[in-house]
Amino acid sequence: MAIKKIRTNDDPVLKRKAKKVTNIDDRLERLLTNMLDTMYEAEGIGLAAPQIGISKRVIVVDIGEDEIYQLINPEIVDTSDEQEKALEGCLSYPGLQGRVTRPVKVTVKALNPQEEEMIIEAEGLLARALQHEIDHLDGITFIDRAEEVFREEESH
């Protein structure tokens, strides 16, 4: 549908807690489509609505496996004790990467666009992507969690 401008760096919308979605309608459906289009155009694996200037608790994630996740009001309801440190980047921080420690497994509860409750048991890259995008909904970026941050060319 439409490619939206991705908000970057210190845009205030990235630091605000997003509002819970109370109405799933055509506007929300368009938002999800625009988010997917924007994410794919930017060659990302996830995008949160605040990253395109919309303060709503909505994320999309596609790590290139079977399912494309379009999640409304997602929340992490459980995490594994086991943690892993890995490199992360973010479409809102172009050219930057950071080492972030996160739980290896998470359980996420959310609504899908059909207003059905979903429970997602995720691990590995999917777990990391879900945590990263849900953080955006709480005004937290990977920069806030990173133990070190550097330009992409410095990571080798």
Curated annotation (Swiss-Prot):
<dbReference type="GO" id="GO:0006412">
    <property type="term" value="P:translation"/>
</dbReference>
<feature type="binding site">
    <location>
        <position position="90"/>
    </location>
    <ligand>
        <name>Fe cation</name>
    </ligand>
</feature>
<dbReference type="Pfam" id="PF01327">
    <property type="entry name" value="Pep_deformylase"/>
</dbReference>
<keyword id="KW-0648">Protein biosynthesis</keyword>
<dbReference type="InterPro" id="IPR023635">
    <property type="entry name" value="Peptide_deformylase"/>
</dbReference>
<dbReference type="GO" id="GO:0042586">
    <property type="term" value="F:peptide deformylase activity"/>
</dbReference>
<keyword id="KW-0408">Iron</keyword>
<comment type="similarity">
    <text>Belongs to the polypeptide deformylase family.</text>
</comment>
<dbReference type="GO" id="GO:0046872">
    <property type="term" value="F:metal ion binding"/>
</dbReference>
<feature type="active site">
    <location>
        <position position="133"/>
    </location>
</feature>
<dbReference type="InterPro" id="IPR036821">
    <property type="entry name" value="Peptide_deformylase_sf"/>
</dbReference>
<keyword id="KW-0479">Metal-binding</keyword>
<dbReference type="GO" id="GO:0043686">
    <property type="term" value="P:co-translational protein modification"/>
</dbReference>
<keyword id="KW-0378">Hydrolase</keyword>
<protein>
    <recommendedName>
        <fullName>Peptide deformylase</fullName>
        <ecNumber>3.5.1.88</ecNumber>
    </recommendedName>
</protein>
<comment type="function">
    <text>Removes the formyl group from the N-terminal Met of newly synthesized proteins. Requires at least a dipeptide for an efficient rate of reaction. N-terminal L-methionine is a prerequisite for activity but the enzyme has broad specificity at other positions.</text>
</comment>
<feature type="binding site">
    <location>
        <position position="136"/>
    </location>
    <ligand>
        <name>Fe cation</name>
    </ligand>
</feature>
<feature type="binding site">
    <location>
        <position position="132"/>
    </location>
    <ligand>
        <name>Fe cation</name>
    </ligand>
</feature>
